[in-house]
């Protein structure tokens, strides 16, 4: 009788045991992806390539957002797949809520409907030749995604401006300079195959160590603010994400470093077929590379600086540029700094492959004139030029040059001076 009961109990409970084992295996994959216990996300080996993790994303909310939470999110050179075939989400958030820096060394591919992919990790993200495929746009952020509980919309991101010693990344032995930081280390390949479709970088500490960040769409950079709002008319409630004031916190640096200062500016930087837009507040920026846009827009490269210092040691090249300097902001075009336009844009050829020949062989003093350069400078801000600025039309407030200090007497900055309308 006892044996019969034991068999019956075994039959009843065997499926449950198997299911538990299966879930445990799927919740943890090859030391690289571990799902947070509060997330319904599942990870498993890809059937075609077992070395590749396949993530079955969480169900979407009413606004098409699939919010996936992890303790670890790393991508090897084998890449990962975000399976969106069943969910059909418009936005796939991958948030690390309790883990160390995310290392992205492979391709992050969306299977099924293309989607906006967000990687969010307050302890930092390092992209080592990482790339994305079948994405509408990509967001890398050290901020916490904030979703409106009333209407399910993604409002924006909250960035930490300080960190407590109890932080897991801090305890792990990393210096404070590495916490809350986004780092890119890529090849110096200028090919037309872009790693990103439309890239958003949101962090108060950003560094391009070497190589290029290349996008066929816009490159948007946000730095210096605690709250980055992407939905107009919304606000992030301070009390909802209030920090504990009784814990001593160490301030994180607000800085953007584009390129290695000892590297070749022709072999590192940002390349976009659309616009490059940097929005920075209370930040120090160093450009040692080449910022290049092949877009026809008058604002193809746009720098919106508030209480920020921009040190340009490299190239800023486009048909049109817009520098908005406000609230004691300073733009220093250093002796090695050059602002102009790629010569090959005058040929009517918009393929970035032409820039390989251009940037490698043509000296900087033969760079073409930028078509339009707008300098919207507040009274307490200033542009100081010790390098090369070459534009056909220069737009300023009331044709005023008081906030522009040109220390190069041999350089005429513009051909025509115009008033900002």
Q: Whereabouts are the PLM-identified features?
A:
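Short, charged helix-to-loop "capping" segments that act as catalytic/coupling loops
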Residues: 110-113, 295-299
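Solvent-exposed adhesion/ligand-recognition segments of exported proteins
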Residues: 3, 20-274, 280-281
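Beta-strand-rich extracellular passenger or scaffold domains
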Residues: 64-70, 91-94, 102-105, 124-127, ...
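Classical Sec-dependent N-terminal signal peptides that target proteins to the secretory pathway
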Residues: 1-23
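Short, solvent-exposed linear patches
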Residues: 195, 217, 297, 319-321
């Amino acid at each position: 009788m006892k044996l019969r009961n034991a068999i019956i109990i075994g039959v009843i409970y065997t499926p449950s045991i198997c299911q538990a084992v299966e879930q445990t295996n799927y919740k943890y994959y090859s030391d690289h992806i571990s799902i947070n216990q509060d997330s319904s996300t599942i990870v498993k080996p890809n059937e075609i390539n077992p070395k590749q993790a396949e993530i079955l994303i969480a169900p979407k909310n009413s606004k098409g957002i699939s919010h996936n939470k992890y303790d670890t999110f790393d991508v090897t050179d084998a890449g990962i797949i975000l399976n969106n075939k069943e969910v059909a989400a418009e936005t796939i958030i991958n948030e690390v809520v309790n883990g160390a820096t995310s290392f992205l060394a492979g391709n992050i591919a969306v299977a099924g409907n293309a989607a906006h992919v967000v990687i969010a990790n307050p302890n930092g993200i390092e992209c080592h030749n990482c790339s994305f495929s079948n994405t509408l746009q990509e967001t890398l952020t050290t901020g916490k995604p904030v979703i409106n509980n009333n209407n399910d919309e993604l409002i924006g991101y909250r960035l930490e401006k300080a960190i407590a010693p109890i932080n897991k990344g801090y305890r792990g032995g990393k210096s404070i300079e590495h916490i809350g930081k986004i780092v890119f280390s890529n090849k110096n390949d200028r090919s037309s195959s872009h790693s990103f479709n439309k890239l958003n970088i949101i962090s108060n500490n950003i560094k391009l160590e070497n190589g290029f960040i290349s996008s066929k769409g816009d490159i948007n950079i946000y730095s210096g603010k605690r709250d980055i709002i992407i939905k107009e008319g919304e606000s992030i409630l301070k009390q909802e994400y209030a920090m504990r004031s009784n814990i001593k916190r160490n301030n994180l640096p607000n800085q953007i470093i584009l390129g290695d200062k000892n590297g070749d500016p022709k072999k590192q930087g940002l390349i976009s077929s659309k616009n490059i837009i940097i929005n920075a507040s209370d930040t120090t920026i160093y450009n040692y590379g080449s910022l290049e846009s092949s877009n026809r827009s008058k604002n193809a490269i746009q720098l919106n600086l508030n209480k920020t210092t921009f040190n340009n040691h490299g190239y800023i090249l486009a048909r049109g540029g817009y520098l908005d300097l406000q609230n004691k902001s300073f733009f220093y075009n250093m002796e090695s700094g050059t602002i102009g336009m790629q010569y090959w844009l005058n040929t009517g050829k918009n393929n970035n492959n032409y820039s390989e020949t251009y940037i490698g062989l043509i000296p900087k003093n033969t760079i073409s004139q930028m078509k339009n350069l707008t300098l919207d400078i507040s009274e307490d801000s200033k542009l100081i030029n010790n390098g090369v600025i070459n534009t056909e039309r220069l737009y300023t407030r009331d044709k005023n040059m008081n906030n522009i200090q040109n220390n190069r007497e041999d350089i005429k900055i513009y051909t025509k001076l115009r008033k900002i309308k």
